[in-house]
Amino acid sequence: MKDELFKQSPKKQFEFDKSVASVFDDMINRSVPFYRENLELCGNLLAKILPINASICDLGCSSANFLIFLANLRKDFKLFGVDNSASMVEVAKSKAKAYGLDISFFETNLCEFDFFVCDVFVANYTMQFIRPPKRQELLDKIYKNLNSKGILIMSEKILYEDAFLSKNIIELYADYKEKQGYSKFEIAAKREALENVLIPYSQKENLNMLEKAGFKKIESIFKWANFETFIAFKD
């Protein structure tokens, strides 16, 4: 379905409810620059470097796009998805079933999730929705539950510290969304709905959190304007 949720002024803050879940795939493909290309980059990298039967847990898996891509790359992967939205988990399960894929899903708040040890944790555009006081604690749990040589892939919308640059990058991003078919009204309405829901950090703040959690080797593997993907290794 096409995302037309913000053709009218929002009546509430943004949340991943049934209305969002029903149009999520269209929304994210039109709202996150190079979403598919970045997903494929991360998936192909993991398929290339991970051992047989590696376990991968997608934290904030939404509609399971990344997990489905991984499942089709390598049949030996053990795949898990976690999301706090019942509607999103329902969509994810439905898609996985339609493709005949064995993926386990958990519907729970990430801050309350009973973590288990994995080779990889993925947090694509997830941390930005976690309340700031809880982010470090969550990253600490991720690090603790990674196997030796474990990997975290984390994608985030980021802030620029320079006000002039930040203003112009934000305007370029708005231009991008217009080119994807969103009107100026829709862009403004969604921005209003996301106020105090999506809270981005700067690149430096994200790197500091990862380092504080214990990660020693951290690299940026993708960036477009105010979107960036980090890969962090436990050892």
UniProtKB/Swiss-Prot annotation:
SUPFAM superfamilies: S-adenosyl-L-methionine-dependent methyltransferases
CDD domains registered for this protein in UniProt: AdoMet_MTases (cd02440)
BP terms from Gene Ontology: tRNA wobble uridine modification
Catalyzed reactions: prephenate + S-adenosyl-L-methionine = carboxy-S-adenosyl-L-methionine + 3-phenylpyruvate + H2O
Top EC class for this record: transferase
Keywords: S-adenosyl-L-methionine, Transferase
E.C. number: 2.1.3.-
Pfam family name, one: Methyltransf_25
Listed GO MF terms: carboxyl- or carbamoyltransferase activity; S-adenosyl-L-methionine binding
Binding site for S-adenosyl-L-methionine: Y35, G60, C61, S62, D83, N84, N124, R191
Transmembrane segments annotated in the record for this chain: none
Database matches in InterPro entries: CmoA, Methyltransf_25, SAM-dependent_MTases_sf
Family: Belongs to the class I-like SAM-binding methyltransferase superfamily. Cx-SAM synthase family.
Protein's job: Catalyzes the conversion of S-adenosyl-L-methionine (SAM) to carboxy-S-adenosyl-L-methionine (Cx-SAM).
Subunit structure: Homodimer.
UniProt-recorded name of the protein: Carboxy-S-adenosyl-L-methionine synthase
Organism classification: Bacteria, Pseudomonadati, Campylobacterota, Epsilonproteobacteria, Campylobacterales
